[in-house]
């Protein structure tokens, strides 16, 4: 028994190690190609700084609090816009998923609005809300709202009709049907929407800050670009990527914890 459990434990460890190696192969290749291009002179360090210079800049900006301050400002904007998008998107998504009249009423208009690129909303929102926080929060809301809404509607609509019939047989009221049948069925799809919405909102806030802001990681990158401080630009890009990956992993973990019945699928 002891040898069997030890073998299984080692086997699981090896599988996880292979998965990890598989995941980091491409990033390692990119870093090596970057180093090769700058060290051999294949690319000018004026347009592509050496990776050692970028890492030194990253260390310096983390040390003096510049980078953490910028990221903190951007994340605070996301917290407001994303939270609002999640609440409105899920509530309206549930309504549209469970009510055909509501679905027909909203869907055409929402589909049309979804086709408008986020970047096109920025000047309009600046006109409406000014260059302050409200315009950035509105951009984030619009970016995150539709992925959450669409995936919530999809999850509700894909609920097994047999389960709905069972609910009717047991005379479950509307709230009981929602909590015991529709919600468990829709949660995996809802979390897909939450994940997509968070990813898009992170990109949206960076883009909005580049166009109309005096603070945040997007502003810092654009400001450094105008001053030709390219190591700062690349340090900011790396920070954006790292924070984005952390947020993606966090929402994936929360999704797995909230939908344990999906583990075996």
Summary of predicted features, one role per range:
Residues 7-38:
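N-terminal signal-anchor/first transmembrane alpha helix
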Residues 10, 16, 40-83:
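Periplasmic/extracellular loop-to-transmembrane helix junction in inner-membrane transport proteins
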Residues 25, 30, 68, 72-96, ...:
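Hydrophobic alpha-helical transmembrane segments of multipass integral membrane proteins
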Residues 69-77, 127-148, 186, 191, ...:
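Loop-to-helix entry region at the N-terminal start of transmembrane alpha-helices
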Residues 91-127, 140, 150-154, 165:
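Cytoplasmic-entry segments and transmembrane alpha-helices of multi-pass inner-membrane transporters
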Residues 100, 234-265:
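C-terminal transmembrane helix and the adjacent membrane-cytosol boundary/short C-terminal tail
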Residues 138, 142, 175-207, 235, ...:
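Transmembrane alpha-helices
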Residues 155-193, 221:
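Short cytoplasmic-facing helical segments at TM-TM junctions of multi-pass membrane proteins
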């Amino acid at each position: 028994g002891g040898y069997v459990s030890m073998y299984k434990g080692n086997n699981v460890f090896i599988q996880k190690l292979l998965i990890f190696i598989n995941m980091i192969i491409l990033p390692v290749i990119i870093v090596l190609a970057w180093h090769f291009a700058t060290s051999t002179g294949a690319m000018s360090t004026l347009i592509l700084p050496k990776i050692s210079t970028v890492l030194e800049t990253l260390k310096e900006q983390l040390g003096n609090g510049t980078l953490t301050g910028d990221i903190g400002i951007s994340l605070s904007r996301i917290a407001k816009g994303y939270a609002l998008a999640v609440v409105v998107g899920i509530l309206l998504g549930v309504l549209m998923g469970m009510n055909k009249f509501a679905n027909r009423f909203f869907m055409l208009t929402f589909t049309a609005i979804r086709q408008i690129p986020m970047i096109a909303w920025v000047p309009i929102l600046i006109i409406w809300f000014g260059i302050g926080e409200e315009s950035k929060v509105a951009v984030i809301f619009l970016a995150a709202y539709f992925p959450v809404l669409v995936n919530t509607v999809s999850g509700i609509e894909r609920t097994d009709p047999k389960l709905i019939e069972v609910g009717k047989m047991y005379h479950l009221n509307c709230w009981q049907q929602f909590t015991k049948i529709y919600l468990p069925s829709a949660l995996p799809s809802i979390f897909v929407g939450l994940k997509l919405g968070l990813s898009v909102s992170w990109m949206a806030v960076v883009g909005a800050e580049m166009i109309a802001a005096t603070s945040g990681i997007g502003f810092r990158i654009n400001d450094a670009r105008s001053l030709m401080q390219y190591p700062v630009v690349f340090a900011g890009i790396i920070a954006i990527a790292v924070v984005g990956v952390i947020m993606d992993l966090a929402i994936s973990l929360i999704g797995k914890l909230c939908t344990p019945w999906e583990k075996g699928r």
